[in-house]
């Protein structure tokens, strides 16, 4: 199945492979290229010594805004931790920019977008720069769980790269198999698109891009949903520690996005290896995966852009309403 994506005026197509499980059909992301086994081994294993890395995020508005939520590691023991920070940051940066742009446009560019007040940069984490020592929502334990999933994905991609060179690869891809959304070995998911979910008491709460979930059920209910634990959430979202039911299809989309971001992170690793204190890797030569290509539909850009902006406006309004209610309660 081919999908079209539209990002900052650029269209690109992506082919998704499908397979069945439990009477349902799922689509999963496949890399558009593979590296050699040596590079995957380098990306999977620890470095000989921890690496200090300057990301250059210090003056970025999104970085200050999410200071209460996210701290990059001070040093990196392995590439998996580096990729972990890369993909968390990519999610948060994209979410901040999309919401800010959408709300600014809705307000005709007047003032700060709702929910994006400058004073919020020094929020509950007490760290306006985002990289200090104050406690943040994404705890070391949550980030370790993400890093473990990154390592597992790198190992799986290495195996897939080797299998793709064998005659049986296409046959294996068509077999029925458990999707990552339900795989007992895959528990941690990062929210990629905004979702509205219902708590056990019937009230609704929101999950937004960058929130972290831990799946605690393996068998879908009658609504094709499974229970998840909110492991890390942003202001105004479902509280950390809450349990909600999330559609299996939504979890699968989260994993697809996660896998795609890991590939982007591996690409950044390949660009930066041997520079600024990062150890050199084996050859970074890539070979294309023919069946991962899809031609983009150039007519969908405006529709995707409008849908993203509408969702961003609605989410920002909900966060502002939650903040107003909280302030009203403090005045009583």
List PLM regions with ranges.
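Conserved beta-strand/loop element in small beta-rich adapter and peptidoglycan-binding domains
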Residues: 204-219
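Low-complexity segments
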Residues: 1-137
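Short, surface-exposed secondary-structure edge patches
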Residues: 178-180, 201-207
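SH3/SH3-like beta-barrel fold
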Residues: 224-232
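SH3-family beta-barrel domains
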Residues: 132-196, 218-220, 240-244, 248-324, ...
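Second-shell loop/turn segments in exported
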Residues: 69, 196, 201
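Short beta-strands and strand-coil junctions in structured, solvent-facing domains, enriched
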Residues: 198, 214, 222, 234-236
